[in-house]
Amino acid sequence: MRLKNNQAYFVKIAKKKAQKFIKLVKKNYPKRIILHNKYQIVEDNHYIFFPLKISPDKINELRKKIGPSLEFEIIKLKAEKRENYEHRTLEEALKGQISKNYYDLIPHSYDIIGEIAIIEFKNNEKMKKKRKVKNKIAKAIIQVNKNVKSVYEKKSKVRGAFRLRKMAHLAGLKGTETLHKENDCIFKLDIIRTFFTPRLNHERLLVSKSNIEKGERIADLFAGVGTFSVQIAKLHDVKIYAFDINPYAYKYLKENIKINNLKGSIIPFNINIKKLINPPNQIEIQLRNKIDRIIMNFPEDSLRFLDVACNLIKEEGGIIHNYQFSEKPNSIKKAIAKFRNEIESYNFIIKEIKRSDIIKSYSPKSDMIVIDAFIEKLNQS
């Protein structure tokens, strides 16, 4: 009983016996779903046809369990999908839509930012000329995820001082601006003009819920659209100085300060933070050695900006949340060594490492590392 495309196995049963059949199914299969809710139930004048969700080798089992109590037939019919049916997996949504040769290209994960899904195809060589396959996979993502309205494909690595990547529209609405909800905060952003990754959700929650004291002065040196700053100020009565070089990120940062009900305050700056100290300007003079805590979420090159951090942090000590990409193996140990060497060159020392961890594997050769360290100026004790 081999199935053709768009066919399924159905139980054909007399209408007057349909209710008894349903009861027997529930009794004999209490923990299994054997009726397929993807397809419409069919009926004619005398019979009802129930679509089955079991493999051919289980049909005899069904006959043995229910057949003695009830007369029915197993037949093949063209299956019509229910209009309100919601696919649970991409594989299910793509069944019969793409060749099985491309099943290995269906992504196991993808980012969802607001109403936009962002997908990356691992085997780009195989997919380069397969626009139709990409489009079908993208449409399947929209089918599986209720809130997704658009799908974009990553077309480059994150690059440049603004940390942006090229994207290509695959399916759904065209538009790169969205509202993203995270940890009781709302972030307005543009996926092409600003940097944002939902994969640091847990890390941002950890930092925002850490032991931050009332009245702290905090510098967020690479604030982006405010993902760290807003979440911290949402929970704590603090003053945050949030810097970003990208004018679009700065625009959205200001909007996100307004749309979130904050306990603390955030002062945004659109500036290259190197310009705080080369030469010193009014902002740096105001903040020099007055900052209690510094966030350095720029893993590609954060160590190069530790001169700015050491210039701002209190000489008697403060906390730096430093993020870096570090080579495997022993990536944490190597990251700490690089961090220590760099701050010592500015006459600071590590008094305590409060946390050091692998945030994620960034590539086959490197990890993304976080170091939460209390540092102070030499000769303070």
Regions found by a protein language model. Give the residues of each.
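SAM-dependent transferase fold signal centered on methyltransferase-like domains
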Residues: 1-381
